[in-house]
């Protein structure tokens, strides 16, 4: 009789256990869906950053004509002249990542000194 009670109890426990697991799985799926919905705006913010106007009124945007570096909007933006006296606002580019970092740093320092001379 005790063996029968042990078998019945273990069978009842085995039947009840998977249903609890299904409930837990459903709750986990719901939480996962909520997490994905909450993460979607963050993914969008990383993929499409907000463009903020950080330039002083009167500074020229990339591609506009210029004569001096201090006229261009951007920390490392320079007036690329080429052969003529008037140029356009832009950034020096190189396919090498290290070279690009060096150009960016050099242009930033040059723009710092250029801003001092343009203010006067």
Curated annotation (Swiss-Prot):
Expressed by the venom gland. Disulfide bonds join 55-73, 66-79, 70-118, 72-89. It comes from the Eukaryota. Residues 1-16 form the signal peptide. One of its GO terms (cellular component) is extracellular region. Keywords: Disulfide bond, Ion channel impairing toxin, Knottin, Secreted, Signal, Toxin. It is found in: Secreted. GO terms for molecular function: ion channel regulator activity; toxin activity. Belongs to the neurotoxin 03 (Tx2) family. 03 subfamily. Ion channel inhibitor. The presence of a 'disulfide through disulfide knot' structurally defines this protein as a knottin. This is U15-barytoxin-Tl1c. It comes from Trittame loki.
